[in-house]
Amino acid sequence: MAGSEEVNLIESKTVVPLNTWVLISNFKLAYNLLRRPDGTFNRHLAEFLDRKVPANANPVNGVFSFDVIIDRQTNLLSRVYRPADAGTSPSITDLQNPVDGEIVPVIVFFHGGSFAHSSANSAIYDTLCRRLVGLCGAVVVSVNYRRAPENRYPCAYDDGWAVLKWVNSSSWLRSKKDSKVRIFLAGDSSGGNIVHNVAVRAVESRIDVLGNILLNPMFGGTERTESEKRLDGKYFVTVRDRDWYWRAFLPEGEDREHPACSPFGPRSKSLEGLSFPKSLVVVAGLDLIQDWQLKYAEGLKKAGQEVKLLYLEQATIGFYLLPNNNHFHTVMDEIAAFVNAECQ
């Protein structure tokens, strides 16, 4: 069982930079207010507490953005981020001009939030996507997928799949060198989970995805692992929290052996023999579900898939949101190298 909140806060303060600690502690407080014991969720309060930013066609630090409706029936929206030439200010007619580059990676990004929180226009994810543009010289398409518990499995996967198909069919995203859309999938927490499941659909439909980037991906199972027992409540998250989110997302009556939660469990499809994208799996050593993340990386390896595991021993959840720690710079360098290796 987790210790007292006072002890947990003291422990987390010793390893987390102050502004990151404040950021994630505020998230934890808000999340506790939003979840209800009966499995419902205070969406109105969640939207009020989540600081959002609009798309901005005026370049900021060399990046401009705009929102696109992908599916009017489901109100599926994505925010597109593009590099801007120095000193230019694109007009509305320029937003979907062909990409200007021999090879331009396109990163389809899925935000975190345990399937229930945040959105494509959340300030923290707007900032992260802008960083990815500058880091990789990429176009980033951030998916505003439907959230649980109002929209359970497989809604988030369906939305991710719809955006991937839209990206793949968008001629203005093709690199000049070979007229191909060079697609990467990336996401954190629940977004990392969505990356895996959308990639499986891509393989089955023969849409070429060059790589998957999973930051602290949200996976699980019915057993309690060593890391879940050891880190329960110590660094912002409890096992009880995670259980609530799985109950909110999975089909009613399902347990955590469902393939959406346990991708290499007894009920999941085998990836052996499939042309699955190569993967970069980033694991924080102070994330209580790290054992499930490590099991995921091992599952890819056993299935004969290419995977690079980046294990950061003293990192906590959310370390990649603020550039105030060495782990942030390490993972950003790894992401850039991972993407650039396929864009020579």
From Swiss-Prot:
PROSITE patterns: LIPASE_GDXG_HIS (PS01173), LIPASE_GDXG_SER (PS01174). It is an enzyme of class 3 (hydrolase). InterPro entries: AB_hydrolase_3, AB_hydrolase_fold, Carboxylest/Gibb_receptor, Lipase_GDXG_HIS_AS, Lipase_GDXG_put_SER_AS. GO terms for biological process: floral organ morphogenesis; fruit morphogenesis; gibberellin mediated signaling pathway; negative regulation of gene expression; positive regulation of gibberellic acid mediated signaling pathway; response to gibberellin. It comes from the Eukaryota. Keywords: Acetylation, Gibberellin signaling pathway, Hydrolase, Nucleus, Receptor. GO terms for molecular function: hydrolase activity. Widely expressed. Its EC number is 3.-.-.-. Pfam families: Abhydrolase_3. A motif (Involved in the stabilization of the negatively charged intermediate by the formation of the oxyanion hole) lies at residues 111-113. One of its GO terms (cellular component) is nucleus. The active site is at S189, D287. The modification N-acetylalanine is found at A2. It is found in: Nucleus. Belongs to the 'GDXG' lipolytic enzyme family. Interacts with the DELLA proteins GAI, RGA, RGL1, RGL2 and RGL3 in a GA-dependent manner. Functions as a soluble gibberellin (GA) receptor. GA is an essential hormone that regulates growth and development in plants. Binds with high affinity the biologically active gibberellin GA4, but has no affinity for the biologically inactive GAs. In response to GA, interacts with specific DELLA proteins, known as repressors of GA-induced growth, and targets them for degradation via proteasome. Seems to be required for GA signaling that controls root growth, seed germination and stem elongation. Partially redundant with GID1A and GID1B. This is Gibberellin receptor GID1C. It comes from Arabidopsis thaliana. The gene is GID1C.
